[in-house]
Amino acid sequence: GAETWQYADLYMPDDESPFQKAGNVPCVMLIHGGFWKEKFTSELMKPIAEDLAEAGIAAWNIEFKRWKEGDEGVWMDTLSDIMRAWGQLALLPNIDVQRTMIMGHSSGGHLALLLAAKAERKPWLTIAQAPITDLIDADASELSDEGDAARRWIGCSPQQNPTLWQQLNPISNPADCPILLV
């Protein structure tokens, strides 16, 4: 994309993959965690991306819009970025689109679950590592280092816009595809 945060790094296996079918390999789209905050980046998932490629599975390590002081309520940009990255993945050469997966950690796990529920093209598997499965509970528990990450990402409290919070809440939007919660 045009913005500095709109990029993804593709990690392909160097050698022939044991998972290869018709010249294509499965791929995992990686979504990092970090309370949806700008200070946390896709560098968090780089070791996993490298390990996946070494094991014979491609990795699509994405970046997306995160909030920062003075630039909050960015949830729509975040979701737009991850949806576009998911769509772009289907266009990459040598990727087996039938075996594409999503993996996210913490707030990235939240985004992975939400993407799996909302995307037209369903992932073969969604892996959510220590995900935020209930945004409203996370907000009530003051999840994050400063206790307000979810409401700053969304831009309001659950009381101010309960419908929006339900739409962004994985527990209210179950995915119709295989899910592995770790």
Label each PLM-derived region with a short phrase.
Residues C27, A53-E63:
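A fold-wide structural signal in alpha/beta-hydrolase
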Residues L30, W36-K37, W67, D134:
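Active-site loop signature of alpha/beta-hydrolase-fold enzymes
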Residues L181-V182:
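Short beta-strand/loop motif that positions the catalytic acidic residue
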Residues G23-G33:
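Short beta-strand element of the alpha/beta-hydrolase
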Residues G1-K21:
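N-terminal cap/lid segment of alpha/beta-hydrolase-fold proteins
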Residues D137-I171:
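Mobile cap/lid helix-loop segments that gate and shape the active-site cleft of serine hydrolases
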Residues K39-A49, W60-V97:
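Catalytic nucleophile-loop/oxyanion-hole region of alpha/beta-hydrolase
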Residues R84-L143:
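Primarily recognizes the serine-hydrolase "nucleophile elbow" in alpha/beta-hydrolase
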